From Swiss-Prot:
Xref: PANTHER family: PEROXISOMAL BIOGENESIS FACTOR 3 (PTHR28080), PEROXISOME BIOGENESIS PROTEIN 3-1 (PTHR28080:SF2)
Source lineage: Eukaryota, Viridiplantae, Streptophyta, Embryophyta, Tracheophyta
Ranges in coiled-coil conformation: 33-62
Transmembrane segments: 15-32
Record key words, sorted: Coiled coil, Membrane, Peroxisome, Peroxisome biogenesis, Protein transport, Transmembrane, Transmembrane helix, Transport
Name of the featured protein: Peroxisome biogenesis protein 3-1
This protein's record includes keyword Repressor: no
Amino acid sequence: MDLVRGLWRKHRRKILVTTTCLGSGYLLYKLYNAHTRKLADLERELANERENDEIIKTQMKAHFDNIQMIADTTTLPHAIHHLSSRVVEEIDVSSIMDKLSKGKGILIPSEKLQLWNELKILSFTRMVLSLWSVTMLSLYIRVQVNILGRHLYIDTARGLGSSHLLDELDLIERDDEQKFLTSADFLATSGMPSLISNMQNAVKEVLKGKQLKDVLTTSALRETVMRILDVFMSTGSPHHWVDYLMMSQDATTDVSSSDATVTKFHLLITETREVLTSNDFSNVAEISLKCCAVALVEEMETQTGLATGMQLAKLLPQIEKTMPEISAEPEKNRFLQLIRDLPEVKLFFTLLYANMPQ
């Protein structure tokens, strides 16, 4: 014991310093080891999140592509076919043309003039209305697809446990998804009467100073079509034309449905209306309509010799020949392809899908 006490007295400072260093070193080792484990856990967590993100992107793209395929191969072709059939039913020019054809030598000049004026109004109404409807319907369905794609992203992310999306609104069920896509028929079923009436008023306003003997050139016809579209779009309340494309928000509430179901479908309609009434969509619609109007007149020019000028009366039968081109099925529809290829349209839908409100 004396030896130990002696050693302690003699080396106490060294022993204390050594013990302190060893203790500190052990503590630092434990802290470093704990920190290393935390870093490793964090790296594994980040790796899992990255893996989940890739799974989300893959599944989202697969399902989104499926929705897009359904829209392109089923929804849009059906909607356009239904639309073109309704236009033919509601704007009948064949009966007037038959009267003119069978009335040669029988009709008095005033009767003949009246029929020709009716044909003038109906032909332009039918052509411009068809062009407007096909253009806007194609854009509308693409808006639908992008909105569904956004909700699909939320659905997939929630299924994989992405916490930052767990507080989103209720998921969109398959029945609501199908109901939403089939609402594209609203234009042909419910919106058509008002659309025809207002488009015809715009045609009458623009053509009231044009006589059947007036000669129209390519530029004059193009200006006439654009003027009709402009008068139609600008007459009435702002974005009045949205009511031709889709049902009102109040109409989406079905008293026989559960509150949850009503909320889900109502949400889709609300988001769609917000997009359609935005300035960005209005700009894209205007660009698309102008592009299609120019293409339509150019097509008529190549087939009729319009470049050198043509009397309005002789132009009317040529206008009727444009109908199959305007309402052709999507795969063969030149106008739909032109719309899809517009840089402004591509950018709009890219931003719409990327920036859908979360």
